[in-house]
Curated annotation (Swiss-Prot):
PANTHER family: PEROXIDE STRESS RESISTANCE PROTEIN YAAA, PEROXIDE STRESS RESPONSE PROTEIN YAAA. InterPro entries: YaaA. It comes from Haemophilus influenzae (strain PittGG). One of its GO terms (cellular component) is cytosol. This is UPF0246 protein CGSHiGG_08495. It comes from the Bacteria. Belongs to the UPF0246 family. GO terms for biological process: response to hydroperoxide.
Amino acid sequence: MLAIISPAKTLDFESAVKNFPVSQPHFTDYSEQLIEVCRKLSPQDLSSLMSISDKLAGLNAARFAEWTKIHNENNSRPALFAFKGDVYTGLDADSLSEDDVIFAQSHLRMLSGLYGLLKPLDLMQPYRLEMGTKLANPKGKDLYAFWGNVITQAVQQAIDAQGDNVLVNLASDEYYKSVKENQLNAKIIKPVFLDNKNGKYKVISFYAKKARGLMCRYLIQHRLTNIEQLKEFDLAGYWFDSASSTETEFVFKRDINE
């Protein structure tokens, strides 16, 4: 069973990280091509392209300038511990055991606009380049054109290594679009998280993102090996609703009190 998640815009390159046997990102040749494109853009260009403040644009221009193809523990950190958005709050990597992290290295992948696909212990340098960015490049008008079939093939290789042909899609639509689902040989499960607010169950973005991380954590800590086990997910008050679910979309509901 393989789970895929999105990266995060919020990064942490300051706090201490446990000593794990790190791995190298696989697609740095591709990353280098994107960096070269980004280095030609001014902070003003980046601000407009990414819809970010001048301050953030300046920071990311500096990051692109400093990025190097050589990744080591002086200029990089493992991806699982570098991302700090809502999904990663739910995943809470810092509290995972060493065995959990080693399991995750085989069963979890992070999609990335710059790196394509990352294993949890792959080293990465700080960057901001969302998959939906309309960055013109030698291969087309955006990052979907740039990555083409590369990410899909890498995901398939990771699925093949599992031996059960199951992919759990916990990524956002923006990032999952980089995976060409019709080219995958896999049973694909998409968990959906609904919260009851004002008497109606619906997707509430903040809660749904955190729940995706919680599902990753559950899959890792319980060493899940088959689809039926996913239905037992019960963290943070969620429960599986069989009546609302299909063979490929697993619906989890929760009642929240505000």
